[in-house]
Amino acid sequence: MSRQGRFGGLMAGLLMLGTLAGCTTAATGGAYLLPQTTQAAAQRSVAADAPLLEVMPVQLASYLEGGSLVYQTDDITLVQASQNLWADDLQDMLTRQLLTQLKASPAQPLSQYRIADTSLSGLKGARLSVSLDRFIGRHDGQSVITGRWRLRGVDGSVLEEGDIQTLTPLTDDGYPALVNSLGEGWRVTGEQLAREIAKALPATADAS
């Protein structure tokens, strides 16, 4: 139980979020954006006729769609914060950051693909779908991201699929630390997805 001891202070701090969520004074509230990934500047250009990977909007469990930060206070209880909210649509933020990371990945043959969201009507390519059932803080001082991903080929067949499970320790108490931890967890998740997708995508003529 050394891990439990390590996060003892953080557990208390995360449980304090429940008190913050119940406060009615604006001073306790906040609106938060996910931290930007540091890879945005590393995105590379690819050939206009390169094969396409479409990234579907990240799907969220219904309780994550309300705009509130969510944390788990014990084994069975989830609490939605009433005063501490996402400043932008969570689905949009997660999808944008996933796109950024996939575009920046050096993994072959992924780096030879055009990567875009599904707004490019009329184009058809491989398709990545991601669904999350947990994007929360937890009473043991960690943020938790869990879900599933699936990669389909141009013909709709499943090329690969798998689970998502990323645990990231909080470095401090409070909502800002929770947001930073979730942001780091999503960055790590994006890197893991890029590696797994690269293994499953068909090679391109330019891939070495």
Predicted feature locations:
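A structural "domain/chain start" motif
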Residues: 23-92, 200-208
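Surface-exposed short loop/turn segments
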Residues: 24-42, 105-155
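Structured, soluble extracytoplasmic/luminal domains of envelope-associated proteins
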Residues: 84-106
